[in-house]
Amino acid sequence: MNPVIKTFQFGQSTVTLETGRIARQASGAVLVTIDDEVAVLVTVVAAKQADPGKGFFPLSVHYQEKTYAAGRIPGGFFKREGRPSEKETLTSRLIDRPIRPLFPEGFMNEVQVICTVLSTSKKTDPDIASMIGTSAALAVSGIPFNGPIGAARVGFHEETGYLLNPSYEQLKASRLDMVVAGTESAVLMVESEAEELTEDQMLGAVLFAHEEFQAVIQAIKEFAAETGRSAWDWQPPVENTALLEAIRAEFGEAISQAYTITVKQERYGRLDELREQTIARLAGDAEGQPSVAEVKEAFGLIEYRTVRQNIVDGKPRIDGRDNRTVRPLKIEVGVLPKTHGSALFTRGETQALVVATLGTARDAQVLDTLEGERKDSFMLHYNFPPFSVGECGRMGSAGRREIGHGRLARRGVQAMLPKDDSFPYTVRVVSEITESNGSSSMASVCGASLALMDAGVPMKAPVAGIAMGLVKEGEKFAVLTDILGDEDHLGDMDFKVAGTAAGVTALQMDIKIQGITEEIMEIALNQALEARLHILGQMGQVIGQSRSELSSNAPTMLSMKIDQDKIRDVIGKGGATIRAICEETKASIDIEDDGSIKIFGETREAAEAAKQRVLSITAEAEIGKIYVGKVERIVDFGAFVNILPGKDGLVHISQISDQRIEKVTDVLKEGQEVKVLVLDVDNRGRIKLSIKDVAAAEASGV
């Protein structure tokens, strides 16, 4: 194929799409360049043969950042890129979510998308370029795909309104960081964090992005047409209506009854029984008989249609609730005696044990990014062990799902944390999901807010989260509050909202179908607000605001400031002085270039002891003040007495006594402790001391 290049304007940026020059053996490959600064190569490869035994669509997306893109060499011993960073994992998920529902039902060929960042200016995130490139690569590949999609980042400022694809610098002043992706007619994915924006402002941002990325979709359509690549000759598998009718006739009523069992494990047990009975009754190896896999797939389709029809017909949900009711809540704080802050948040059959830990500035996570090294003083980690769903499973490092859910929960609470300059602790929150039946990430938001308040972290306001769902059949639809796991799996939308009583702090939306209108999104947001306020009210009855003092288990932090020319005295030669203070007091000390000092101690006593040591090192001798010092050295004309760490003064022989002294050693000995009065400090820092004037000074009340 001859190279094809398409250039178009996207907001203030010039975007260039190129194919046919690089990676020509891939099914589709596009080099995306934005403003001659960001360049991302996106390749798509699809297997020629289907893999129907998978049971799910085998799509994988890999976003990778090469350090050479920013003119850097990787750190570490091996000096090459290693396992995906958290940023790469999150961006891979961001690209996966809007494209997955656009592959046609029944398409089971493995598809792999690889996005490689080749160049970046460090001014903007390459994720939007990667999403545009993925859409374009799929469009030119000929693989069955109901696209193209567009994508945009949106910021918000009170004075300027919505910003399209803001830079990192613009995002610092923005109250919103939102990524939206969708097709020409529908929004499919939203990922955002905000500073208490209203529901209307959030919806406005979604609609603004959808309108703006129409330019991307139109350009990709024209680009794909120019390549002239023919579409795959693929036909969807024919639905086995006879098998579906047989299952519905014999087991349909039993399946419907199973979905009235409110306890999850009992319901799953009954459905497993029915599935096995169906397989035994209908599957076989004889000619014309369906296979076990075909029967399982058909059984799942009957489940899907049964639950959805019940919901749109207005029947009670699986657990008997109506569409607006939140499951019963049980909220506890301070559940672990030796942690800094803890909470146990239970919503129905979903439960999160959340623990907050405070650390020093040295505990901050160091992130090695394309933009350079930076520190992160807030971490939220989400763990989903297999026992939470009553299963045996893999244990090990966090998977993509856990990283994604942890980041969503972090987005929910981060805006309500105090700024580093007023609360210089590193904060780590860990959410252990101990039970799961829907929306464990939003349980993590609620639990994180509770644990942070229990630890005494001065939160601006409590935060709660809720997951909404949608079932749409034709013109009929139902928006569901606080969805169960089954409703998430069988529904058309997963819509998670976190926020305070005043506004939204995080919004995540994944839509599996087209045709979600502005009206439906507005209903979902307002219904989520109602549920969020209900949960906040319940949380407020247990703990309404942060505790007035930090947990007694948390480290004590003391702040002070010294003159910049004293920093070297505190550090000492080769760090000897500060190291000795830390070892002796068991505290840690962080010194900034401007002289700001933060002292962290496991106990208040340890922190105070370290502070006093620093004060004694940096203190200046005050004229007229009495000190207790030690005689360090005796000379013919007097004695040198140490009154402060590193500060000696001279007691002239005439200042030792009112009586005449022939030899200093007749009165003083090295190592002897004496009281001295500071008479003067000259402009070279030399200190003049007196022993004989101490009595008079004490009598006058010095």
UniProtKB/Swiss-Prot annotation:
SMART domains: KH, S1. It comes from the Bacteria. Signal peptide: none annotated. It catalyses: RNA(n+1) + phosphate = RNA(n) + a ribonucleoside 5'-diphosphate. CDD domains: KH-I_PNPase (cd02393), RNase_PH_PNPase_1 (cd11363), RNase_PH_PNPase_2 (cd11364), S1_PNPase (cd04472). It is found in: Cytoplasm. Its cofactor is Mg(2+). Mg(2+) binds at D488, D494. One of its GO terms (cellular component) is cytosol. Keywords: Cytoplasm, Magnesium, Metal-binding, Nucleotidyltransferase, RNA-binding, Transferase. It is an enzyme of class 2 (transferase). Its EC number is 2.7.7.8. One of its GO terms (biological process) is RNA processing. GO terms for molecular function: 3'-5'-RNA exonuclease activity; magnesium ion binding; polyribonucleotide nucleotidyltransferase activity; RNA binding. Belongs to the polyribonucleotide nucleotidyltransferase family. Component of the RNA degradosome, which is a multiprotein complex involved in RNA processing and mRNA degradation. HAMAP family: PNPase. Involved in mRNA degradation. Catalyzes the phosphorolysis of single-stranded polyribonucleotides processively in the 3'- to 5'-direction. This is Polyribonucleotide nucleotidyltransferase. It comes from Azotobacter vinelandii (strain DJ / ATCC BAA-1303).
